[in-house]
Amino acid sequence: MDLRSELFELSMSEQAQPLMDAVQIHIRDNVDPITEEFFRLNDEKQDRWSWHPRQLELLDGAKNKAKDIGLWNFFLPESDMGAGVNNLDYAYIAAELGKSPLASETLNCSAPDTGNMEVLERVGTPEQKDKWLTPLLNGEIRSAFAMTEPGVASSDAKNISTSAVLKNGEWVINGEKYYISGAGDPRCKIMITMVKTSPDAPPAKQQSQILVPIDTPGVEIVEGMRVFGQDHAPKGHMHIRFNDVRVPEENMLLGEGRG
Protein backbone atom coordinates (compact mmCIF):
# COMPACT_ATOMS: atom_id res chain seq x y z
CA MET A 1 0.00 0.00 0.00
CA ASP A 2 1.45 3.39 -0.98
CA LEU A 3 1.51 6.32 1.45
CA ARG A 4 -1.53 8.04 -0.06
CA SER A 5 -3.61 4.88 0.15
CA GLU A 6 -2.42 4.28 3.70
CA LEU A 7 -3.43 7.79 4.76
CA PHE A 8 -6.95 7.26 3.46
CA GLU A 9 -7.34 3.76 4.91
CA LEU A 10 -9.20 4.60 8.09
CA SER A 11 -11.02 1.35 8.73
CA MET A 12 -10.55 -0.59 11.92
CA SER A 13 -8.09 -3.42 11.43
CA GLU A 14 -9.23 -7.03 11.27
CA GLN A 15 -6.94 -7.79 14.20
CA ALA A 16 -8.90 -5.39 16.41
CA GLN A 17 -12.32 -6.88 15.69
CA PRO A 18 -12.12 -9.58 18.41
CA LEU A 19 -11.13 -6.89 20.88
CA MET A 20 -14.07 -4.72 19.83
CA ASP A 21 -16.37 -7.73 20.22
CA ALA A 22 -15.04 -8.31 23.73
CA VAL A 23 -15.53 -4.65 24.64
CA GLN A 24 -19.14 -4.74 23.45
CA ILE A 25 -19.80 -7.91 25.45
CA HIS A 26 -18.20 -6.34 28.54
CA ILE A 27 -20.42 -3.28 28.25
CA ARG A 28 -23.52 -5.42 27.75
CA ASP A 29 -22.80 -7.87 30.57
CA ASN A 30 -20.84 -5.84 33.14
CA VAL A 31 -21.52 -2.13 32.61
CA ASP A 32 -25.09 -1.69 31.41
CA PRO A 33 -26.53 -3.77 34.30
CA ILE A 34 -24.94 -1.49 36.95
CA THR A 35 -25.51 1.89 35.31
CA GLU A 36 -29.01 2.64 36.56
CA GLU A 37 -28.18 1.73 40.17
CA PHE A 38 -24.91 3.67 40.00
CA PHE A 39 -26.59 6.95 39.13
CA ARG A 40 -29.59 6.36 41.39
CA LEU A 41 -27.17 6.25 44.33
CA ASN A 42 -26.32 9.91 43.71
CA ASP A 43 -29.61 10.75 45.43
CA GLU A 44 -28.56 8.88 48.58
CA LYS A 45 -25.31 10.77 49.21
CA GLN A 46 -25.12 13.41 51.92
CA ASP A 47 -22.21 15.12 50.17
CA ARG A 48 -22.38 15.63 46.39
CA TRP A 49 -18.58 15.80 46.27
CA SER A 50 -18.13 12.24 47.47
CA TRP A 51 -18.88 8.75 46.22
CA HIS A 52 -21.41 6.41 47.76
CA PRO A 53 -19.50 3.28 48.88
CA ARG A 54 -21.80 1.17 46.74
CA GLN A 55 -20.90 3.23 43.65
CA LEU A 56 -17.22 2.43 44.11
CA GLU A 57 -18.10 -1.22 44.74
CA LEU A 58 -19.99 -1.36 41.44
CA LEU A 59 -17.17 0.33 39.53
CA ASP A 60 -14.45 -1.82 41.06
CA GLY A 61 -16.40 -4.97 40.26
CA ALA A 62 -16.69 -4.03 36.59
CA LYS A 63 -13.04 -2.92 36.47
CA ASN A 64 -11.83 -6.21 37.92
CA LYS A 65 -13.85 -8.18 35.36
CA ALA A 66 -12.37 -6.11 32.52
CA LYS A 67 -8.84 -6.42 33.85
CA ASP A 68 -9.18 -10.19 34.24
CA ILE A 69 -9.86 -10.62 30.51
CA GLY A 70 -7.27 -8.09 29.30
CA LEU A 71 -9.59 -5.17 28.52
CA TRP A 72 -7.31 -2.63 30.15
CA ASN A 73 -5.12 0.37 29.27
CA PHE A 74 -5.73 0.53 25.52
CA PHE A 75 -4.15 3.97 25.06
CA LEU A 76 -0.40 3.14 25.10
CA PRO A 77 0.20 1.77 21.59
CA GLU A 78 3.99 1.55 21.77
CA SER A 79 4.45 0.48 25.37
CA ASP A 80 4.56 -2.91 27.03
CA MET A 81 2.49 -1.27 29.77
CA GLY A 82 -0.52 -1.04 27.45
CA ALA A 83 -2.60 -3.40 25.36
CA GLY A 84 -0.74 -2.74 22.10
CA VAL A 85 -3.74 -1.17 20.35
CA ASN A 86 -2.81 1.40 17.71
CA ASN A 87 -4.40 4.83 17.76
CA LEU A 88 -6.77 4.20 14.84
CA ASP A 89 -8.17 1.02 16.33
CA TYR A 90 -8.41 2.70 19.73
CA ALA A 91 -10.46 5.49 18.16
CA TYR A 92 -13.12 2.95 17.17
CA ILE A 93 -13.05 1.37 20.62
CA ALA A 94 -13.25 4.79 22.28
CA ALA A 95 -16.31 5.60 20.18
CA GLU A 96 -17.95 2.44 21.49
CA LEU A 97 -17.00 3.30 25.07
CA GLY A 98 -18.49 6.75 24.62
CA LYS A 99 -21.97 5.27 24.32
CA SER A 100 -21.91 4.49 28.05
CA PRO A 101 -21.21 6.97 30.87
CA LEU A 102 -19.27 4.34 32.83
CA ALA A 103 -17.59 2.12 30.24
CA SER A 104 -14.33 4.00 29.74
CA GLU A 105 -13.52 4.04 33.45
CA THR A 106 -14.16 0.32 33.78
CA LEU A 107 -11.39 -0.24 31.21
CA ASN A 108 -9.09 2.37 32.82
CA CYS A 109 -9.40 4.49 29.69
CA SER A 110 -10.83 7.73 31.11
CA ALA A 111 -9.48 11.22 30.64
CA PRO A 112 -7.57 12.96 32.07
CA ASP A 113 -5.86 9.84 33.39
CA THR A 114 -5.08 8.50 29.91
CA GLY A 115 -3.15 11.59 28.86
CA ASN A 116 -1.39 11.85 32.21
CA MET A 117 -0.34 8.21 32.05
CA GLU A 118 1.04 8.71 28.54
CA VAL A 119 3.12 11.65 29.76
CA LEU A 120 4.46 9.73 32.75
CA GLU A 121 5.18 6.64 30.65
CA ARG A 122 7.13 8.67 28.09
CA VAL A 123 9.08 11.12 30.24
CA GLY A 124 8.69 10.15 33.89
CA THR A 125 11.68 9.12 35.97
CA PRO A 126 11.71 5.60 37.45
CA GLU A 127 10.77 7.10 40.81
CA GLN A 128 7.88 9.12 39.32
CA LYS A 129 6.61 6.07 37.49
CA ASP A 130 6.75 3.92 40.60
CA LYS A 131 4.96 6.48 42.76
CA TRP A 132 2.30 7.71 40.33
CA LEU A 133 2.19 5.79 37.05
CA THR A 134 1.90 2.33 38.57
CA PRO A 135 -1.19 3.09 40.69
CA LEU A 136 -2.75 4.93 37.75
CA LEU A 137 -2.15 1.98 35.42
CA ASN A 138 -3.67 -0.30 38.05
CA GLY A 139 -6.76 1.90 38.32
CA GLU A 140 -6.12 2.52 42.02
CA ILE A 141 -6.11 6.34 41.90
CA ARG A 142 -7.29 9.16 39.62
CA SER A 143 -5.47 12.29 38.43
CA ALA A 144 -5.94 15.76 36.96
CA PHE A 145 -4.17 18.02 34.47
CA ALA A 146 -3.97 21.62 35.68
CA MET A 147 -3.36 24.01 32.79
CA THR A 148 -6.35 26.30 32.12
CA GLU A 149 -6.20 29.72 33.80
CA PRO A 150 -8.71 32.57 34.18
CA GLY A 151 -8.75 35.37 31.66
CA VAL A 152 -6.44 33.92 29.01
CA ALA A 153 -6.60 31.50 26.08
CA SER A 154 -4.97 28.68 28.01
CA SER A 155 -4.71 26.26 25.10
CA ASP A 156 -1.64 28.35 24.23
CA ALA A 157 0.80 27.45 27.00
CA LYS A 158 2.68 30.72 26.47
CA ASN A 159 -0.24 32.47 28.19
CA ILE A 160 0.19 30.53 31.43
CA SER A 161 1.16 32.71 34.40
CA THR A 162 1.13 30.32 37.37
CA SER A 163 4.72 30.52 38.60
CA ALA A 164 7.12 27.99 40.05
CA VAL A 165 10.35 29.23 41.65
CA LEU A 166 13.09 26.89 42.86
CA LYS A 167 14.03 27.59 46.49
CA ASN A 168 16.17 25.32 48.65
CA GLY A 169 15.43 22.22 46.63
CA GLU A 170 11.69 22.84 46.34
CA TRP A 171 9.46 24.32 43.67
CA VAL A 172 7.29 27.04 45.20
CA ILE A 173 4.12 27.38 43.13
CA ASN A 174 1.71 30.32 43.08
CA GLY A 175 -1.21 30.93 40.76
CA GLU A 176 -4.75 30.05 39.84
CA LYS A 177 -6.34 27.42 37.60
CA TYR A 178 -9.85 27.09 36.17
CA TYR A 179 -11.91 24.09 34.98
CA ILE A 180 -9.52 21.40 36.23
CA SER A 181 -11.48 18.28 35.33
CA GLY A 182 -11.51 15.44 37.82
CA ALA A 183 -9.82 17.37 40.63
CA GLY A 184 -12.95 17.16 42.77
CA ASP A 185 -12.89 13.35 42.77
CA PRO A 186 -11.85 12.06 46.21
CA ARG A 187 -9.76 9.45 44.37
CA CYS A 188 -7.71 12.15 42.60
CA LYS A 189 -4.24 12.09 44.15
CA ILE A 190 -1.93 13.83 41.66
CA MET A 191 -2.05 16.78 39.26
CA ILE A 192 0.29 17.39 36.36
CA THR A 193 0.49 21.16 36.65
CA MET A 194 1.58 23.56 33.92
CA VAL A 195 3.67 26.40 35.35
CA LYS A 196 6.02 29.15 34.23
CA THR A 197 9.54 28.51 35.53
CA SER A 198 11.72 30.47 33.13
CA PRO A 199 10.16 33.90 32.39
CA ASP A 200 13.36 35.21 30.79
CA ALA A 201 13.70 32.31 28.34
CA PRO A 202 12.30 32.35 24.78
CA PRO A 203 8.47 32.14 24.91
CA ALA A 204 8.30 28.46 23.96
CA LYS A 205 10.78 27.48 26.69
CA GLN A 206 9.28 29.26 29.69
CA GLN A 207 6.83 26.53 30.69
CA SER A 208 7.32 23.37 32.70
CA GLN A 209 5.15 20.57 34.04
CA ILE A 210 5.39 19.64 37.71
CA LEU A 211 3.78 16.81 39.65
CA VAL A 212 1.71 18.24 42.50
CA PRO A 213 0.00 15.87 44.96
CA ILE A 214 -3.48 17.28 45.46
CA ASP A 215 -3.18 17.13 49.25
CA THR A 216 -0.05 19.33 49.30
CA PRO A 217 -0.40 22.24 51.76
CA GLY A 218 -1.39 25.39 49.90
CA VAL A 219 -3.48 23.63 47.24
CA GLU A 220 -6.88 25.29 47.66
CA ILE A 221 -9.85 23.83 45.82
CA VAL A 222 -12.09 26.88 45.70
CA GLU A 223 -15.21 25.49 44.07
CA GLY A 224 -16.66 23.32 41.36
CA MET A 225 -17.25 25.28 38.16
CA ARG A 226 -20.13 24.71 35.77
CA VAL A 227 -19.93 23.62 32.14
CA PHE A 228 -23.21 24.03 30.23
CA GLY A 229 -24.90 24.44 33.61
CA GLN A 230 -23.51 21.22 35.12
CA ASP A 231 -20.78 20.86 37.74
CA HIS A 232 -20.38 17.10 37.17
CA ALA A 233 -19.87 16.36 40.86
CA PRO A 234 -18.07 14.58 42.35
CA LYS A 235 -15.38 14.61 39.66
CA GLY A 236 -16.04 18.22 38.75
CA HIS A 237 -14.21 20.97 36.91
CA MET A 238 -12.47 22.74 39.74
CA HIS A 239 -11.28 26.25 40.45
CA ILE A 240 -7.92 25.80 42.21
CA ARG A 241 -5.49 28.24 43.83
CA PHE A 242 -1.84 27.46 44.50
CA ASN A 243 -0.73 29.40 47.57
CA ASP A 244 3.02 28.93 48.14
CA VAL A 245 2.66 25.25 47.29
CA ARG A 246 5.97 23.47 47.84
CA VAL A 247 6.95 20.23 46.12
CA PRO A 248 10.37 18.55 45.81
CA GLU A 249 12.66 19.57 42.97
CA GLU A 250 12.46 16.02 41.59
CA ASN A 251 8.74 16.47 40.88
CA MET A 252 9.67 18.28 37.65
CA LEU A 253 8.73 16.34 34.51
CA LEU A 254 11.43 15.98 31.83
CA GLY A 255 13.21 19.24 32.71
CA GLU A 256 12.81 22.96 33.26
CA GLY A 257 11.40 24.77 30.24
CA ARG A 258 10.26 21.57 28.52
CA GLY A 259 6.57 21.72 29.44
Each model region followed by its residue ranges:
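Flexible, glycine-rich active-site loops centered on histidine and acidic residues
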Residues: 117-123, 145-146, 200
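Amphipathic, small/basic residue-rich leader segments at the start of a protein or domain
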Residues: 1-111, 122, 127-131, 135
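Short Ser/Thr-interspersed hydrophobic loop/turn segments at strand-loop and sheet-helix junctions
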Residues: 70, 93-99, 194-196, 212-217, ...
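Short Gly/Pro-enriched turn/cap motifs at secondary-structure boundaries
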Residues: 151-155, 182-186, 199-201, 228-236
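A structural signal for short hydrophobic beta-strand segments in well-ordered beta-sheet cores
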Residues: 162-165
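A glycine-rich, basic-preceded beta-loop-alpha segment at the flavin cofactor/substrate interface
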Residues: 214-259
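A short, Trp-centered hydrophobic/proline-enriched beta-strand micro-motif
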Residues: 139-148
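A short core secondary-structure module
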Residues: 169-170, 174-222
